[in-house]
């Protein structure tokens, strides 16, 4: 066996992380446990477990190389690449790729005969001699993978000799390496080398093809089109103890917020504990509540001022009552609002293409399918609409999530399942406009004023997607619940199960500085902060993992939508490295 696979010394450091296996993302199909060791560079998969391990650090651009070696076992094993929407559930939806299972669009080598396999029709370069030329039968052989994400091709080799190139599917997603047991009934072990031992051949047994690099965060930073932004300059979460003083200043943000969402952590009634949303388009003292269909209200003791590093919450019971504790989630858009005429209805808009957040107001026309400019420059993946003028029956908050499509509507102020609706006139948002049916009073009542909040994915800052719950406990759920890759360390996560009545749940890393987060709030009810084991989530350096079998986040086969915003991106261009969080001993 190769010394470079078996060395006890690796170059991994906090400022330059190297690729490894990701045990939080493994697919365990049966009861026997898989195992990792040697710094997550060795995988053991028992005979009755046809399981798969993906690696960390998914790849979206650049040229990458790594090596794999068997360490005994059956000849039925797979080495290869899998899409970044890979999930721990065989039939799951994840990362917003609707209808894809974890094995769709893989390109692998079945090492029993080294024959290429792909579940993506037409994606593999045909070469009838490939299997015979690359026969692979011994654990001393080194399998080589060269992945070119710029040309979207992958090439496999053995002991320094490469076969033909394979075309990646036209799915526009990123890819990552993975290993898998080929069939039940076979026990296999795998050793991986991502070059972290250093030395000749960039740390590998065989020299990578020209231009191909080892997988580590410094190389990723150079090669991949990551976001040139600092998350804390666009999103922040702050907490404070109320004092009923209008002059009270809440600071700690690195920006002047355009949207401030305040929630009492102690109070649980609409009079004292409502979700309060303030925005710079409408100005201080004006608010709407996400847990109520009421129209916009004004209160002279509500939020007094948006400041360069925070805000003044006022002395109102719902924002700064003495003896209560509060949290505010804050976003930066584009500052001063401007008129936008991209649609056939003018909007008053503030937008940040850099952070993927905009908000705008418009006036309802009373009829017809109308378009509204949103200012993001790319398709929104989530938006919510509220009538500011009318709070009577049916003027709920309407919400769109891209994975559910234009024919589906959710309600931010309700725990219900949502359902089919023509509210968007069956028209998906575009890079410039959102279509809304003004025949619905809650979307276009003639003369009424409406507000829309829009978000889209920004690599390294925000992630909007969908996952499927595993439910139960033991192997199929609980501690082995879904892992959702974000590409950053989340500061804030909102989750809603679709298809069942369950609350919209918000968790953040400011109220819960250690894992698992066990304090959650709701958007749809003015309840006090709840704690306990039913909503455990780990906020990790590259995503989040569901730790509880509870129905609100992990119902078996449940369909869950999520939004996540970053604390720190990975890799970071600003010398900030995502770090692990302390674990609470209660979980």
Residue ranges and their predicted role:
Residues 1-63, 69-74, 83-587:
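Surface-exposed molecular-recognition determinants
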Residues 79:
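Active-site region of the double-stranded beta-helix
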